[in-house]
Swiss-Prot record:
GO terms for cellular component: plasma membrane. PANTHER family: COB--COM HETERODISULFIDE REDUCTASE SUBUNIT B 1 (PTHR42947:SF1). This is Dihydromethanophenazine:CoB--CoM heterodisulfide reductase subunit D. Its cofactor is [4Fe-4S] cluster. It comes from Methanosarcina mazei (strain ATCC BAA-159 / DSM 3647 / Goe1 / Go1 / JCM 11833 / OCM 88). Part of a complex that catalyzes the reversible reduction of CoM-S-S-CoB to the thiol-coenzymes H-S-CoM (coenzyme M) and H-S-CoB (coenzyme B). Binds 2 [4Fe-4S] clusters per subunit. Pathway: Cofactor metabolism; coenzyme M-coenzyme B heterodisulfide reduction; coenzyme B and coenzyme M from coenzyme M-coenzyme B heterodisulfide: step 1/1. Residues 14-44, 81-110 form the 4Fe-4S ferredoxin-type domain.
Length: 409
């Protein structure tokens, strides 16, 4: 009789992650905080605890004592498909890791489980499976021509051919959310910062692939990282600036892992860069904003990398800004709902999470809801529009540009 093979495998899980699966005490603290669980109407399968317990059951059926004695118990395909849907119904925001009493690194775990399933031919979710082909072929997820990478650059913006500082625009800002790119470039010019850009040599950072469990597909993410690092080196980069939290996280955390070496340049978010200039008294403001502003921490910038204070420092020093905090901030903020491929794969769920976050902002009576990420901005705008709320959603760098008397159009 042919030997039965397990329905799942452990090849993509580290020894630590296997121990973490066993360390969950089922306390349920993560369930109270999970944004997608709440936005789904408390669908049990989306709860972090439930996902860990179900995978633990799968492991027991495949590799437990009974499985060793009598062979693995087959896990119905329908169960695996349902689990795939639930593990992809997560923004990988990381709040469950923050509140976990057992210290489980859930963000890494969810991504490992997604990769495990994709390798078995289960997943990713919906149109997320187009990411490797699109990004591999076009070097961006929007099927845009690479020759158009710098089409957004207005005549008044000066870009050096080579410079110590390189602005990595990102696909979203460079193709879709041009106000973010305008603001960043003009602010750098205004402050006398000489900077270069990669132009058509800038490829996608790979975040969308990594977050959705497709880090291994055709080796695309590693090739993206390798190409971008080499292109940045050719530009003479000593410091690379990012206005996109997703690109920033991918470059700072994922690229070194993919390449197996430290990056030969410093990775800095533009909020950190501006905060340092303010501390050195190198910014001369020209206009008072005179608005009440609250701030949403992007998960990729905040919980994933630990940049919480710089954006707040910048906002609090913009003339006329009355800065107010929402109820859930910093390590305990509520996700905007766009991350982890949820905006692309399950837009209704992403919108539900965004609506919850917009309600947090409305409770502060702020005029402006700001953030440091184009994905957060897009989804928060969608949440605002869905709720028909009269509130401006702007990136911090856009507010800085306005206070410097600059256009963002």
């Amino acid at each position: 009789m042919a030997k039965k093979t397990p329905s799942i495998d452990t090849k993509n899980l580290t020894a630590v992650q296997l121990m973490e699966l066993d360390s969950c005490t089922r306390c349920g603290e993560c369930v109270k905080w999970c944004p997608t669980y709440a936005a789904s109407g408390q669908k049990p399968g989306l709860a972090p605890r439930d996902k860990i317990l179900r995978w633990r059951q799968f492991m027991n059926k495949s590799y437990g004592i009974k499985a060793k004695l009598f062979g693995p118990t087959e896990i119905p395909q329908s169960e695996l498909e349902e689990f795939k849907d639930d593990v992809h119904g997560c923004t990988t925001c990381g709040i469950c890791a923050t509140v976990c009493e057992s210290g489980i690194n859930t963000v890494e775990l969810w991504e490992a489980l997604r990769t495990n399933l994709v390798k078995k031919g289960i997943g990713p979710f919906g149109k997320q499976n187009m990411f490797p082909k699109l990004i591999g072929q076009y070097h961006n997820p929007y099927m845009k021509d690479q020759k158009d990478r710098l089409n957004w650059v207005p005549p008044d913006v000066k870009i050096e051919d080579k410079a110590d500082v390189v602005y990595f625009t990102g696909c979203t800002a460079g193709y879709n959310q041009l106000a973010l790119a305008f603001a960043t470039a003009r602010v750098l010019n205004k402050l006398g910062v000489k900077f270069s850009m990669l132009g058509e040599e800038e490829w996608c950072c790979g975040s969308a692939l990594i977050r959705t469990g497709q880090v291994h597909v055709d080796d695309v993410p590693r090739e993206l990282a390798r190409h971008n690092v080499e292109a940045l080196k050719k530009k003479g980069a000593k410091k690379v600036l990012y206005a996109c939290a997703g690109c920033f996280r991918a470059s700072k955390v994922d690229w070194p892992r993919l390449l197996g070496e430290e990056l030969p340049f410093e990775v800095v978010h533009v909020a950190e860069f501006l905060a340092d200039l303010i501390k050195q008294d190198k910014i001369k403001w020209e206009k008072s904003i005179n608005k009440t502003v609250t701030y949403h921490d992007p998960c990729h910038l905040g919980r994933h990398v630990g940049v919480f204070d710089a954006p707040r420092y910048v906002l609090s020093h913009i003339p006329g800004v009355k800065f107010v905090e929402m109820d859930r901030v910093k390590e305990f903020q509520r996700c905007c709902g766009a991350g982890g491929g949820v905006k692309a794969g399950i837009p209704d769920l992403a919108l539900g999470v965004a609506e919850s976050r917009v309600k947090d902002a409305v409770a502060t009576d702020a005029d402006i809801l700001s953030s440091c990420c184009p994905f957060c901005k897009r989804n928060l705008m969608d949440g605002r529009d869905s709720l028909k709320v009269d509130m401006v959603v702007e990136d911090v760098i856009e507010l800085v540009a306005e206070a410097l008397g600059l256009e963002t159009k």
